[in-house]
Amino acid sequence: MTVILAIESSCDETGVGIAELTPDGSVVLLADEVASSVEEHARFGGVVPEIASRAHLEALGVTARRALDLAGVQRPDVVAATIGPGLAGALLVGVSAAKGLALAWGVPFYGVNHLGGHIAADVYENGPLPECVALLVSGGHTSLLHVRSLAEPIEELGATVDDAAGEAYDKVARLLGLGYPGGKVLDELAQQGDSSAVPFPRGMTGPRDARHSFSFSGLKTAVARYLEKHGVEADFSPADVAAGFQEAVADVLTMKAVRAATDLGVSTLLIAGGVAANSRVRALAEQRCAETGLTLRVPPLRLCTDNGAMIASFAAHLVAAGAQPSSLQAAADPGLPVVKGQVH
């Protein structure tokens, strides 16, 4: 058995996960500890890179100690870390710590892709991942991916050409005065509204648009213009606006994801990333997968957002596939593409 300790520090969550790779290739989660600095960023309306980096420095040691104690592990067999994509300073904190631990313990270091980690998080509760189309949707990324296995390069079928879906959520939440982060609170507000009361446009859904690409900037602008025109009216309903916006996002995401799976002839759709926790995205995906005979896989809510467990899982799959460790000179790559699962 191989025990992997993994560090996630790409944005504002400091995560340390510990997983065990068993002889049969299964990955078992032993510990998952997360410290978030989201409250420190909330007063600025978004993530401040310098604050995020400092928060990682302050939280990482304590978080790692908690994870080791919870797992009952003294010395892992492998140390891994998110090496990209993400905020440069934040990545450097986690990567530097992981390299130091690997050197001190005398174990291999694996610098792995954050986006691959989101996909790998699914295996803890849903078992080995078959060939699938993955809809990776978060604050910084919205992509459709063809995943043959977690040990092979991931193919990007399409991505957002402007705002990520999670970014659009935060911006619309700010327009509605809901604060930051906006995803969860906007979702809750939308559940109180009528999604058909305020119809909003669905970007890049025309016959000439790229089948597997997304655009949310026009939707964000449409919400802003609606608020400028109707926000002062006596019967204005923020809940209806939230519901209409959320329906537009969920409609496009799930429609294109199901279509991509059908185009490729695969039978499984995986939705991963922070926006995979959204209630309407999950419900509409379940409905459309049932209608088309697709198997839907979504990680549990606690593993949708950034965490160390997902990085441990992805690293475990690389180890199982015989991937060589990363060099201790491997550099963090803020723009690391999803097709590159590991930096050597």
Swiss-Prot record:
Protein's UniProt keywords contain 4Fe-4S: no
EC number(s) per entry: 2.3.1.234
Biological process terms in GO annotation: tRNA threonylcarbamoyladenosine modification
Function: Required for the formation of a threonylcarbamoyl group on adenosine at position 37 (t(6)A37) in tRNAs that read codons beginning with adenine. Is involved in the transfer of the threonylcarbamoyl moiety of threonylcarbamoyl-AMP (TC-AMP) to the N6 group of A37, together with TsaE and TsaB. TsaD likely plays a direct catalytic role in this reaction.
EC main group: transferase
GO cellular component: cytoplasm
One Pfam family linked to the record: TsaD
Cofactor(s) recorded in Swiss-Prot or TrEMBL: Fe(2+)
Organism the protein comes from: Mycobacteroides abscessus (strain ATCC 19977 / DSM 44196 / CCUG 20993 / CIP 104536 / JCM 13569 / NCTC 13031 / TMC 1543 / L948)
Name by which UniProt lists this protein: tRNA N6-adenosine threonylcarbamoyltransferase
Cofactor, how bound (note): Binds 1 Fe(2+) ion per subunit.
Keyword presence, Transmembrane helix: no
Gene coding for it: tsaD
Family statement: Belongs to the KAE1 / TsaD family.
Alphabetical UniProt keywords: Acyltransferase, Cytoplasm, Iron, Metal-binding, Transferase, tRNA processing
UniProt catalytic activity: L-threonylcarbamoyladenylate + adenosine(37) in tRNA = N(6)-L-threonylcarbamoyladenosine(37) in tRNA + AMP + H(+)
Places the protein is found: Cytoplasm
Annotated Gene3D superfamilies: 3.30.420.40
